[in-house]
């Protein structure tokens, strides 16, 4: 049975958060990026978090949010971890005294190891597919062979993962965790319970 951890990202409904928890997900992701079809309001986020059972990590995803916007969200929503998906500097990421993940959009020629060193206080790096002008949630995979074997940060693998390819991804990359959004959806922002169950079964090798 795989010990790889998992996050279901882009949660917008209480029932989807509960489905993720019941299927064995370790974390849920809440998107605070207004341009995303999976964005949630503060009120939505609070209701979702209030409905969660214990020991589910809540991750807030931000894209180039201002300090004021982010602090207002943190004052109102009980987030366990931050996920920065934009062009935030290490200093900006460090400025909220919260554990954080830095997303890196991977393409050929990138020095992922150097990026890990740059964001030295990140708890992990989320490796996602590079699509110009799109900060994430593309639904496309990237060449996993581009990921170095000796990164000094836990790797959270994202980008086009589904129940059909996540076992292969885990075997090849050996990530700390996998992150899925579109791969478990009926439509953008609306999760599919059966797809969540199938994805988690593939992650756990059951």
UniProtKB/Swiss-Prot annotation:
Its EC number(s): 5.3.1.24
Provide the top EC class: isomerase
Q: Which reaction does it catalyse?
A: N-(5-phospho-beta-D-ribosyl)anthranilate = 1-(2-carboxyphenylamino)-1-deoxy-D-ribulose 5-phosphate
Q: Which GO terms describe its molecular function?
A: phosphoribosylanthranilate isomerase activity
Q: Which Gene3D superfamilies match?
A: Aldolase class I
Q: Which key words tag this protein in UniProt? A: Amino-acid biosynthesis, Aromatic amino acid biosynthesis, Isomerase, Tryptophan biosynthesis
CDD domains per the UniProt record, alphabetical: PRAI (cd00405)
- Which biological processes are named by the entry's GO terms? L-tryptophan biosynthetic process
Report the pathway entry.
Amino-acid biosynthesis; L-tryptophan biosynthesis; L-tryptophan from chorismate: step 3/5
Note one Pfam family from the annotation.
PRAI
* Highest taxon listed in the record's lineage: Bacteria
Alphabetized HAMAP family for the sequence: PRAI (MF_00135)
Q: This protein is called what?
A: N-(5'-phosphoribosyl)anthranilate isomerase
Gene of this entry: trpF
């Amino acid at each position: 049975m795989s010990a790889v951890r998992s996050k279901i990202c882009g949660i917008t409904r209480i029932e989807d958060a509960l489905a993720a928890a019941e299927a064995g997900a370790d974390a849920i992701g809440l998107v605070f990026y207004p341009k995303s079809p999976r964005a949630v309001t503060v009120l939505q986020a609070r209701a979702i978090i209030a409905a969660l059972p214990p020991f589910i990590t809540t991750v807030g995803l931000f894209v180039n949010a201002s300090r004021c916007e982010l602090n207002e969200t943190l004052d109102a929503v009980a987030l366990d971890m931050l996920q920065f998906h934009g062009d935030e500097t290490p200093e900006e990421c460090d400025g909220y005294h919260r554990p954080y993940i830095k997303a890196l959009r991977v393409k050929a020629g990138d020095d992922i190891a150097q990026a890990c060193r740059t964001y030295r206080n990140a708890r992990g790096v989320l490796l996602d597919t590079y699509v110009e002008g799109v900060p994430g949630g593309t639904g496309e995979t990237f060449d996993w062979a581009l990921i170095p074997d000796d990164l000094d940060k836990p790797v959270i693998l994202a980008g086009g993962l589904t129940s059909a390819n996540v076992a292969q991804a885990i075997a090849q990359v050996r990530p700390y965790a996998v992150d899925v959004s579109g791969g478990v959806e009926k439509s953008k922002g609306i999760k599919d319970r059966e797809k969540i169950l199938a994805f988690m079964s593939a992650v756990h090798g059951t």
